[in-house]
């Protein structure tokens, strides 16, 4: 597979770079001699095969271990110091990139763009200390842990894995990781398939801006009906599922459609009108019938393969407990959200208080204007009445003067009526704004108290994930080596064996190893069941036909003893 060269070059380059920048330091356990390097790496690599979870388990280990290969089994302290020195030289990320390139070229030779399946594996970290926390689905609780970003290709081939803090989100990591992965692999990524965590609008906007293709599921898909979409094209049968059909669609709301760069693919059973599944993403030139088929490959190619690592390669085990202290990012985000709510309430309260002040000014202005107009009309009305009396005393015609008096009375009544109407309207508005201001004042006090109750001062622990990344690299390496052995050497009936099952049936099989000058002979104990005995005989024959040599050049021969011979 080419992993030997990749591991050696990456480790030695990291060691040289570390010693150049730290000339006073010494790496006693991380030797430049490759022959001394591999025994320690193999002890870490084959921990699941030996039935141990972490280096400290070798402290009480009583098995044969790798004694048949190296003549000895390392104990706890040597392996722990070796792993610690690998951590010091920061080999985790470079090793992950180098091995990813090897895996991609091994399983998918050539330069064709790759379709990858991605998902998080979240493992808990049991600690009593205040640490970054997130949701752990398998435990149904919020607790400290580590997120591992797992990448698989078609047929479930492992392409790589990276550790992230527990509060990481796919929206902020995936597009950048794809670009970096293309550089390290030297291959384009044709499409990325993920679960509903990647179906939101923020990630869709990032993918649209980057011009990349991805397929996900619309979150809350069952809240949408067919009337919410406008179909683009006609329904077509789903690939490998003649009982269902799919079609492309967009939002029926023009404003929503203009703001959302995502495309949608609706799927429904034949004979039904409403969609039962809504896929979203950027589909490039794929047909609507291919989208459900491709997304369904997540289960065998990604989900089940992660479970194989959990059961067969100690994926849930934590390595390394070094930490740094810093502000709790979750609490910081909670404080920022609470501060935003406080700011919204403050703006609303300020608006209502400004409205109250403005209405009071308008009431005062209205009162002053009304008083001035009322005095003027009263004065004119008094003068006109005097004029009517004067004319009556002089025996002159007073009809026109009386009409003017009646007109002034009507104007005065209209002025009073309009003033009272306007005053009542302004008082109602003032009461509404004052009531709302009182309510908002109480809400502001509550929200301010909730914001201030969020502890942003206490520092929390964030675990250093470098050692965990190194072990993740080795876990994926072990799984890929198992896949390679399964495809290259195992009998056809054993091609579907998981790593856990193969460890129980094959890798831990007792036997006898004899070292000769020109060859190494391994004789395994016979199997109890005839079908397993025949499968192992076929496996040994295929392995021996490949003429595999040990590291020192000796020919390696494996056979299984017949029942009663061993």
Predicted regions mapped to residue ranges:
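Dynamic "connector" segments at or just before major functional cores
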Residues: 1-142, 148-167, 175-184, 410, ...
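Short amphipathic alpha-helical "interface-anchor" segments enriched in bulky aromatics
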Residues: 58, 288-323
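A short acidic (Asp/Glu
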Residues: 127-129, 200-207, 224-230
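Short, surface-exposed basic-aromatic patches at helix termini and helix-loop junctions that form
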Residues: 179-186, 203-213
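Acidic, metal-coordinating catalytic cores used for nucleic-acid/nucleotide bond scission
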Residues: 192-202, 220-223
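An anionic, glycine-rich sequence signature occurring as long contiguous blocks
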Residues: 210-305, 392, 396, 400, ...
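Charged, amphipathic alpha-helical linkers/stalks
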Residues: 306-367
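Extended alpha-helical coiled-coil "stalk/arm" regions
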Residues: 352-419, 423-436
């Amino acid at each position: 597979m080419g992993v030997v060269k990749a591991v050696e070059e990456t480790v030695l380059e990291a060691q040289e770079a570390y010693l150049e920048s730290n000339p006073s330091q010494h790496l006693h356990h991380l030797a430049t001699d490759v022959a001394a390097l591999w025994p320690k790496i193999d002890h870490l690599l084959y921990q699941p095969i030996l039935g141990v979870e972490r280096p400290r388990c070798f402290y009480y280990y009583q098995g044969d271990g790798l004694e048949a290969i190296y003549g000895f089994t390392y104990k706890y302290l040597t392996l722990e110091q070796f792993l610690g020195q690998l951590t010091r030289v920061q080999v985790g990320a470079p090793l992950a990139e180098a091995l990813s390139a090897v895996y991609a070229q091994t399983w998918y030779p050539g330069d064709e763009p790759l379709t990858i399946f991605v998902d998080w594996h979240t493992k808990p970290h049991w600690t009593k200390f205040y640490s970054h926390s997130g949701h752990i689905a398998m435990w149904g609780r919020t607790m400290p842990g580590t997120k591992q970003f797992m990448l698989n290709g078609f047929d479930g081939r492992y392409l790589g894995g990276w550790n992230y803090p527990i509060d990481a989100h796919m929206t902020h990591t995936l597009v950048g990781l794809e670009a970096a992965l293309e550089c390290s692999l030297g291959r384009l990524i044709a499409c990325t398939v993920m679960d509903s965590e990647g179906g939101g609008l923020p990630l869709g906007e990032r993918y649209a801006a980057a011009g990349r293709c991805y397929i996900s599921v619309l979150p809350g898909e069952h809240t949408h009906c067919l009337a919410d979409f406008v179909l683009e094209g006609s329904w077509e049968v789903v690939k490998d599922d003649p009982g269902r059909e799919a079609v492309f669609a967009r939002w029926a709301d023009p404003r929503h459609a203009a703001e959302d760069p995502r495309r949608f693919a609706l799927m429904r059973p034949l004979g039904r009108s409403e969609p039962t599944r809504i896929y979203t993403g950027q589909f490039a030139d794929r047909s609507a019938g291919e989208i459900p088929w491709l997304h369904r490959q997540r289960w065998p190619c990604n989900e089940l393969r992660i479970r194989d690592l959990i059961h067969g390669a100690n994926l849930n085990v934590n390595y390394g407990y070094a930490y740094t202290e810093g502000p709790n990012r979750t609490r910081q985000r909670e404080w920022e959200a609470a501060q935003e709510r406080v700011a919204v309430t403050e703006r609303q309260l300020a608006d209502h208080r400004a409205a109250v002040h403005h209405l009071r000014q308008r009431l005062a202005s209205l009162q002053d204007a009304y008083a001035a107009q009322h005095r003027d009309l009263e004065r004119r009305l008094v003068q006109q009445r005097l004029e009517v009396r004067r004319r009556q005393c002089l025996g002159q015609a007073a009809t026109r003067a009386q009409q003017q008096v009646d007109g002034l009375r009507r104007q005065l009544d209209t002025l009073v009526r309009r003033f009272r109407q306007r005053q009542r309207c302004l008082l109602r508005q003032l009461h509404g704004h004052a009531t709302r201001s009182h309510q908002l004042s109480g809400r502001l006090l509550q929200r301010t108290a909730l914001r201030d109750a969020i502890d942003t001062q206490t520092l929390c622990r964030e675990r250093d994930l470098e050692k965990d990344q190194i072990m993740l690299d080795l876990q994926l390496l072990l799984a890929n080596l198992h896949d390679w052995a399964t495809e290259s050497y195992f009998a056809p009936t054993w091609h579907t064996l998981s790593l856990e099952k193969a460890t129980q049936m094959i890798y831990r099989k007792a036997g006898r190893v004899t070292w000769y000058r020109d060859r190494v002979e391994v004789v395994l104990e016979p199997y109890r069941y005839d079908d397993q005995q025949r499968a192992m005989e076929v496996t040994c024959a295929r392995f021996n036909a490949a003429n595999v040599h040990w590291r020192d050049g000796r020919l390696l021969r494996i056979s299984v003893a017949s029942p009663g011979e061993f």
